[in-house]
């Protein structure tokens, strides 16, 4: 059974459940669970340069970039939907920003698309709470108000190779499969 539910933290909150707006819509519209200010990436970079001066370099390693991100806080804003999604075996949930978000508001997902695996549901770290990683490419900070549509969730099937031998189990929440 595939279904959306509120996470316990937002059980009594007045948040719209994800819905498809038309009969032929692929995506379920997702809304922000609370108010957020999405900082301008340009402002973040200016502030980050004061904390972590950037020298004349062609590249940094992934380890250096992780340190930069941790020390400066220069990263996408995690916008909660207050929702989780129970998926059947063989399904995954794709998260995408609304098609108007980059065009009108300069908002994009930091990870291009979000991938929610079936075993993310009810994980011990965050109950499977669905977040959108949002970057603001505009020169201004942008406010997203509680209840505003922030993206879409599309339920999709997946396939595995004939020789697939995956047998591990999820041990955490957000980003835990790469830890």
Spell out what each predicted region is.
Residues 1-179:
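DUTPase catalytic domain/fold
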